[in-house]
Amino acid sequence: MRSDMIKKGFDKAPHRSLLKATGLKDEDFDKPFIAICNSFIEIIPGHKHLNEFGKLVKEAVRAAGMVPFEFNTIGVDDGIAMGHIGMRYSLPSREIIADSVETVVNAHWFDGMICIPNCDKITPGMMMAALRINIPTVFVSGGPMAAGKTSKGEVVDLSSVFEGVGAYQSGKISEEELKDIEDHGCPSCGSCSGMFTANSMNCLCEVLGLALPGNGSILAIDPRREELIKQAAEKLKILIERDIKPRDIVTEEAIDDAFALDMAMGGSTNTVLHTLALAQEAGLDYDMNRIDAVSRRVPHLCKVSPASNWHMEDIDRAGGISAILKEMSRKEGVLHLDRITATGQTLRENIAEAEIKDKEVIHSLENPHSEEGGLRILKGNLAKDGAVIKSGATEVKRFEGPCVIFNSQDEALAGIMLGKVKKGDVVVIRYEGPRGGPGMPEMLAPTSAIAGMGLGAEVALLTDGRFSGASRGISVGHISPEAAAGGMIALLEQGDIVCIDVEERLLEVRVSDEELEKRKKEWKRPEPKVKTGWLGRYAQMVTSANTGAVLKIPNFD
């Protein structure tokens, strides 16, 4: 066993002595040592319950004849961090999480790992670590939150609360109505109830094969989560015995299938960023062109909030992720069904018994929302290396209008609230990319303000930053190269006409090449917003969004 490095041989007497101080007995040194990578954090509702959850995981590991050791990672709640400097720490926290898991697991020579993530950057951070460490691993997330209901019986979620702020600001609802939405938008523990980033990544984790069937959709408060825990411990033991590791599971074909589900469900645009980062950790050459190819061949079968009023509980009731995959498998060339997963079985075997139980929630191949996926990659003179739009969350497929330019999210939000944005405008928020932000903050507050003011279909928004999975409307993010790297978005001027064509996958500014070249020569890189601490280091090392915004090793030659 891998853990023999710290427990076998006369020279490991000091190690065993220390381990006995934690409660181990001599007989435990013949069993696999399992890292329980938890993320219990009281300020994050998606993680509030994970303390008790972790205890259940440890019990299941012991029952399977292995020895559990629990530790916790940090985490950032994107909703609470939204709209202030806290959001700059969100994406960078993914790297800290990956590094911290790598540190604990490699320092102590564990034989296997069970990861307990749930919310936005915590799931991909742990997934990156699992691929980097590459020991047998199973993921069991904390599960989605249920949707809420206002006193009037209206179904609401966190997206409703953010949009309620814009609606109140524009006089569409009263303060009492906003308070009602606030009180009921997040009714329980769990990851926010729509197809936002957390749930998108937990669903993708299931498709990739790192998590068990049901992981993406079974609610946090559902007793079936406990059954998943028991299965996870049993399956991990099999993975250890068969020496099946994350890099055996997460192949290019597995990533294709993850994006196929993403397209079928119209997941968060953040999935593109995180899954590209996973590919980097797995040593795979996977780019946005391949994502676009997946988008072109996968129909959009399922709309979940913010694209509709359906939530993860409805997906679960309708058959879960397995039912969506089973339907997709009917179309040739969409899924790779014979690859191995964390169950020890193939994807084909995992979904064999699945079926759609509600065709209003999960559409059939014969009745898709659209013939192509719910996410699309746009390119053009404004995004040479690509940009992303959640096409399934807007009915507008072509938009052209003059730019209203803001050089930060704070500046943009103030401008929107002051009425500086009108019907037909293209709002540009730049210098908010991985390097420029720094940290590539999410733009949920501006998009929600626009939607709440009733302009969601009449105003477009472009940014080199990110969008929350709760964002909707004509929102194009991840524009690469970013402004801080001298990308074309930095060269835009007030009033420039920008064209967004979702069907043709184009993002262009109606300015001549000669004029753009002239502006580029005159452009000067602004001073970094942050020069010290973790964010200062991050800004110097982070790569572009089109490569996953991962950290690069500085070249000292």
Swiss-Prot record:
Q: Does the keyword Lyase apply?
A: yes
Q: Which InterPro entries match?
A: Dihydro-acid_dehy_C (IPR042096), DihydroxyA_deHydtase (IPR004404), DiOHA_6PGluconate_deHydtase_CS (IPR020558), ILV_EDD_C (IPR056740), ILV_EDD_N (IPR000581), IlvD/EDD_N (IPR037237)
Task: Identify one Pfam family in the record.
Answer: ILV_EDD_C
GO terms under cellular component:
cytosol
According to the lineage, what is the superkingdom? Bacteria
- Chain sites annotated for binding Mg(2+): D78, D120, K121, E442
One GO BP: L-valine biosynthetic process
Enzyme Commission code(s) on record = 4.2.1.9
Q: Which Gene3D superfamilies does the protein's record reference? A: IlvD/EDD C-terminal domain-like
Residue positions, PTM N6-carboxylysine: K121
The cofactors required by this protein are: [2Fe-2S] cluster; Mg(2+)
Decide whether keyword Iron-sulfur is in the record.
yes
Indicate which residues the UniProt annotation says bind [2Fe-2S] cluster: C119, C192
**UniProt entry keywords in alphabetical sequence:** 2Fe-2S, Amino-acid biosynthesis, Branched-chain amino acid biosynthesis, Iron, Iron-sulfur, Lyase, Magnesium, Metal-binding
Which Gene Ontology MF annotations are present?
A: 2 iron, 2 sulfur cluster binding; dihydroxy-acid dehydratase activity; magnesium ion binding
Function field? Functions in the biosynthesis of branched-chain amino acids. Catalyzes the dehydration of (2R,3R)-2,3-dihydroxy-3-methylpentanoate (2,3-dihydroxy-3-methylvalerate) into 2-oxo-3-methylpentanoate (2-oxo-3-methylvalerate) and of (2R)-2,3-dihydroxy-3-methylbutanoate (2,3-dihydroxyisovalerate) into 2-oxo-3-methylbutanoate (2-oxoisovalerate), the penultimate precursor to L-isoleucine and L-valine, respectively.
What family is this? Belongs to the IlvD/Edd family.
Q: What is the protein name given in its UniProt record?
A: Dihydroxy-acid dehydratase
Q: Gene for this protein?
A: ilvD
